[in-house]
C-alpha cells in the first residue's frame, strides 16, 4: 500500500435432494444412524506456513473435537518474513533490522475471501484501505467475518537489540533464542471456529510505514485432521467381503485359583500376545457370544449348566442399561477418547434410570435418576470403566462440554450389552420337535442386559475386591467389551458403506448385514436357527462348535508338526519355490564340472602314462629290429 499516512481508515466491508433410497432402507432395517459424533476426538494439527519461502512458522497438534480444537498459535514475525525485507532495512537477517521491524505497526488482509479492489498476492490482498481485517495498528483494524485475529505478543517494543542468545554473551539484555523478538499470537474468531477448513486459508501481512511502500509477506493456515473418517468406496461393495469362516475354534479357559510360586522362584513375565488379525464374520460373532457366555458363567454359573445363547437377526443388536456412576473431568482429551473408541450408532432401547448430562427432553426424562448440568469451561467428561455415554448423536466414551454448550445434545451413562437372548434347553428342543409344545403364552426372552444389568457399577469392571473372582471377572468383562467394540465397528462400517455405495439398488438391499452374517453361520453348521435367532449350545465346558472347526485345528497342528520335523534342506524347498527350479537347472552342469575337477587329473595322468608306455614299446621294437639286422650282417661276414 503506497502513499502517505491516512487519518481515518475506511470501514470494514462484509462481504437437492438427499439419498432417499438409502434412507428408506436404513429406516426399514431399524438402525439409527447419525453423522460422526460431535464429541468424537481427533488428532488436529494447525500449520502456519510462510508462502514466500515455503517454511513452516508454527505446527501445533492437539487432541480435541471439531468444535473446540482451536488453540492459540504462537510464532515470530521473522518466521513469516525471512530475508524478504532486507532491502528495506527491516529484514530479519540482522539484529538492527529485527529491532526496527518491532517499532512499526502491521495489518493483515484475507486472501481466502478477497473483496473487490483489494488486489492479489503482490499487494498482500491489501490493495486499498479497508481491506485489512486484523493486525496491530493505531486504528485497531478488526472484522466481524474474518476467521482469525493476529496481534503482537507480550514483548515490550522498547526492549534492547534483538541479538541471538546463542551467538552473543549472556550478559547482553534483550537477547532471545534465534534473535526472535517480534512474537505474534494468532487466535480464532467465532466465525473461524464455525468455518470449513477443508483447504488452506491465505492472508497477506504488511508493515505500516508513514512513507514509502509497505513491505509485504504472505502466509497460510491449514488444518490437518487424522482419522477423520472411512474412505469412500468406488467399485465392488466391500460390505460382504469379510464374511469369512472362523479361523480357529475359540478356546475357553475356565477360571483356576492362583497357585503360589515356589519359594525362591523368580516372577514370570507373561508373554506378549501376538498381534491381532482382522476378524471375519464367524470369528467376530462367535467372540461376541463367547464373551457373553464368559460373563454369564462367572456371575451366574447355575444358568450355564445347560443353555442356549442366541444372536438375533433383526435390530436392535445392542441394548443399554442406564446406571449411576462417577465420571472424571479432564482439561484435555484423555487417551481413551481416541477415534477408535467413538461410535456414531445410537441406541434404540435404553432401560433403567441413571446419570444424565445436559437438559433432557420430557420424552426421555424417565431415564434420569440424577441430572447434572455442565459448568462453564472447556473440558472432557470421561465415562467410568465399563460404561459409555449414550447421546442422541451416538455412543462416545467422552463428552466435550464445549459441544454440549453449543448444541442441544443430551447424554445418559449406560452399560452396553449385546442383544443375546438366553433360552433353556427344554424350550429350544420343543421348538425343533415334530409336535411342538404349545404354550399358553410365549415365554419371556431373557436377554444379557436383563441378566447382567448393573454389573459394572457393582464393582466387577473396576476390579473391586482382592479375591480371585474379582480379578477373573474383570478379565472376562474386558473380553466381552473388546468383542462388542469390534462388532460395533463392523456394523458401523457396513452402514457407512451403504451410505456411500455407488452400486445398484439390488446390491444395497442384499446388504442386510446381520441377517447375512447369521445365515452364513447357519449354512456353515456353526449354529442352530431358532425362528429369527442363531443359537449356540453352551455348558460348563464352553460353547460347542462344529466338528469341522476341530478338524481344521488338527490339520493345522499336523501341518506345523510336519514342518517342524523337516530338515533345513527340505525347508529350503518349501520356503523358496524358485529354489527348486534353480537347483534343477544348474545341478546337471554343476555335477559334470565337479566330476571333471575330481577325476580329470587322474584320467589325464593315466592317458599320458599310457601314451608314454606305447611310445616306449615302439622305441624298444625299433632298437630290437636294428640290433637284429646288425647281428645278421656280422654272422654273414664271419662265415665268409
Swiss-Prot record:
Residues 604-640 are cytoplasmic. The keyword Transmembrane applies. It comes from the Viruses. Residues 33-582 are extracellular. Glycans are attached at residues 43, 58, 297, 329, 336, 369. It holds the Pfam family TLV_coat. A motif (YXXL motif) lies at residues 627-630. Residues 1-32 form the signal peptide. InterPro entries: FMuLV_rcpt-bd, TLV/ENV_coat_polyprotein. Residues 510-526 are annotated as: Immunosuppression. GO terms for biological process: fusion of virus membrane with host plasma membrane; symbiont entry into host cell; virion attachment to host cell. Residues 473-509 form a coiled coil. Keywords: Cleavage on pair of basic residues, Coiled coil, Disulfide bond, Fusion of virus membrane with host cell membrane, Fusion of virus membrane with host membrane, Glycoprotein, Host cell membrane, Host membrane, Host-virus interaction, Lipoprotein, Membrane, Palmitate, Signal, Transmembrane, Transmembrane helix, Viral attachment to host cell, Viral envelope protein, Viral penetration into host cytoplasm, Virion, Virus entry into host cell. One of its GO terms (cellular component) is host cell plasma membrane. Specific enzymatic cleavages in vivo yield mature proteins. Envelope glycoproteins are synthesized as an inactive precursor that is N-glycosylated and processed likely by host cell furin or by a furin-like protease in the Golgi to yield the mature SU and TM proteins. The cleavage site between SU and TM requires the minimal sequence [KR]-X-[KR]-R. The R-peptide is released from the C-terminus of the cytoplasmic tail of the TM protein upon particle formation as a result of proteolytic cleavage by the viral protease. Cleavage of this peptide is required for TM to become fusogenic. The record marks 441-442, 621-622 as: Cleavage. The 17 amino acids long immunosuppressive region is present in many retroviral envelope proteins. Synthetic peptides derived from this relatively conserved sequence inhibit immune function in vitro and in vivo. The surface protein (SU) attaches the virus to the host cell by binding to its receptor. This interaction triggers the refolding of the transmembrane protein (TM) and is thought to activate its fusogenic potential by unmasking its fusion peptide. Fusion occurs at the host cell plasma membrane. The transmembrane protein (TM) acts as a class I viral fusion protein. Under the current model, the protein has at least 3 conformational states: pre-fusion native state, pre-hairpin intermediate state, and post-fusion hairpin state. During viral and target cell membrane fusion, the coiled coil regions (heptad repeats) assume a trimer-of-hairpins structure, positioning the fusion peptide in close proximity to the C-terminal region of the ectodomain. The formation of this structure appears to drive apposition and subsequent fusion of viral and target cell membranes. This is Envelope glycoprotein. It comes from Mink cell focus-forming murine leukemia virus (isolate CI-3).
Amino acid at each position: 500500500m503506497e502513499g502517505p499516512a491516512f487519518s481515518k481508515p475506511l470501514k470494514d466491508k462484509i462481504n437437492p435432494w438427499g439419498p432417499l433410497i438409502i434412507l428408506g432402507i436404513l429406516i426399514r432395517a431399524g438402525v439409527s444412524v447419525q453423522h460422526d459424533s460431535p464429541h468424537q476426538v481427533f488428532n488436529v494439527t494447525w500449520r502456519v506456513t510462510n508462502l514466500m519461502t515455503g517454511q513452516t512458522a508454527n505446527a501445533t497438534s492437539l487432541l480435541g473435537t471439531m468444535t473446540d480444537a482451536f488453540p492459540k498459535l504462537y510464532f515470530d514475525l521473522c518466521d513469516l518474513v525471512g530475508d524478504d525485507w532486507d532491502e528495506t532495512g527491516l529484514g530479519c537477517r540482522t539484529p538492527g533490522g529485527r529491532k526496527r521491524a518491532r517499532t512499526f505497526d502491521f495489518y493483515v488482509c484475507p486472501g481466502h475471501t478477497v473483496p473487490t479492489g483489494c488486489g492479489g498476492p503482490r499487494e498482500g490482498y491489501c490493495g486499498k484501505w479497508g481491506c485489512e481485517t486484523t493486525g496491530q495498528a493505531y486504528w485497531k483494524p478488526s472484522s466481524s467475518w474474518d476467521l482469525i485475529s493476529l496481534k503482537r505478543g507480550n514483548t515490550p517494543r522498547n526492549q534492547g537489540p534483538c541479538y541471538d542468545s546463542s551467538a552473543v554473551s549472556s550478559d547482553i539484555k534483550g537477547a532471545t533464542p534465534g534473535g526472535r523478538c517480534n512474537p505474534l499470537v494468532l487466535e480464532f474468531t467465532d466465525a473461524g471456529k464455525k468455518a470449513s477448513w477443508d483447504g488452506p486459508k491465505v492472508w497477506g501481512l504488511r508493515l505500516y510505514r508513514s512513507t514509502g511502500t509497505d513491505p509485504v509477506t504472505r502466509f497460510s493456515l491449514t488444518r490437518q485432521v487424522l482419522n477423520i473418517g472411512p474412505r469412500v468406496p468406488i467399485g465392488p461393495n466391500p460390505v460382504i467381503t469379510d464374511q469369512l469362516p472362523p479361523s480357529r475354534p475359540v478356546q475357553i479357559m475356565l477360571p483356576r485359583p492362583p497357585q503360589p510360586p515356589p519359594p525362591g522362584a523368580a516372577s514370570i513375565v507373561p508373554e506378549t500376545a501376538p498381534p491381532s488379525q482382522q476378524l471375519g464374520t464367524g470369528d467376530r460373532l462367535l467372540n461376541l457370544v463367547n464373551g457373553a457366555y464368559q460373563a454369564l458363567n462367572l456371575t451366574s454359573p447355575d444358568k450355564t449348566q445347560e443353555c442356549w445363547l442366541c444372536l438375533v437377526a433383526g435390530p436392535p443388536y445392542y441394548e443399554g442399561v442406564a446406571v449411576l456412576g462417577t465420571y472424571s473431568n479432564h482439561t484435555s482429551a484423555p487417551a481413551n477418547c481416541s477415534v477408535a473408541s467413538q461410535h456414531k450408532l445410537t441406541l434404540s432401547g435404553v432401560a433403567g434410570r441413571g446419570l444424565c448430562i445436559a437438559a433432557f427432553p420430557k420424552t426421555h426424562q424417565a431415564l434420569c435418576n440424577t441430572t447434572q448440568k455442565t459448568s462453564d469451561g472447556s473440558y472432557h467428561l470421561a465415562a467410568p470403566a465399563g460404561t459409555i455415554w449414550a447421546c442422541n448423536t451416538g455412543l462416545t466414551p467422552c463428552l466435550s462440554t464445549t459441544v454440549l454448550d453449543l448444541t442441544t445434545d443430551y447424554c445418559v451413562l449406560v452399560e452396553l450389552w449385546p442383544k443375546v437372548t438366553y433360552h433353556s434347553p427344554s424350550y429350544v428342543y420343543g421348538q425343533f420337535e415334530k409336535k411342538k409344545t404349545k404354550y399358553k403364552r410365549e415365554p419371556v426372552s431373557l436377554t444379557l442386559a436383563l441378566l447382567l444389568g448393573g454389573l459394572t457399577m457393582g464393582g466387577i469392571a473396576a476390579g473391586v475386591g482382592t479375591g480371585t473372582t474379582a480379578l477373573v471377572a474383570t478379565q472376562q468383562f474386558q473380553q466381552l467389551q473388546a468383542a462388542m467394540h469390534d462388532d460395533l465397528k463392523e456394523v458401523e462400517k457396513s452402514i457407512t458403506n451403504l451410505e456411500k455405495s455407488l452400486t445398484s439398488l439390488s446390491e444395497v438391499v442384499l446388504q442386510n448385514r446381520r441377517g447375512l452374517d447369521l445365515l452364513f453361520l447357519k449354512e456353515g453348521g456353526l449354529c442352530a436357527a431358532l425362528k429369527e435367532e442363531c443359537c449356540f449350545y453352551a455348558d460348563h465346558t464352553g460353547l460347542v462348535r462344529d466338528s469341522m472347526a476341530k478338524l481344521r485345528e488338527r490339520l493345522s497342528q499336523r501341518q506345523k508338526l510336519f514342518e517342524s520335523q523337516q530338515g533345513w534342506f527340505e525347508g529350503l524347498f518349501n520356503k523358496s519355490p524358485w529354489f527348486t527350479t534353480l537347483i534343477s537347472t544348474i545341478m546337471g552342469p554343476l555335477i559334470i564340472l565337479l566330476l571333471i575337477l575330481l577325476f580329470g587329473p587322474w584320467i589325464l595322468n593315466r592317458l599320458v602314462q599310457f601314451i608314454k608306455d606305447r611310445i616306449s614299446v615302439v622305441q624298444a621294437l625299433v632298437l630290437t629290429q636294428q640290433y637284429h639286422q646288425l647281428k645278421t650282417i656280422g654272422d654273414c661276414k664271419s662265415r665268409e
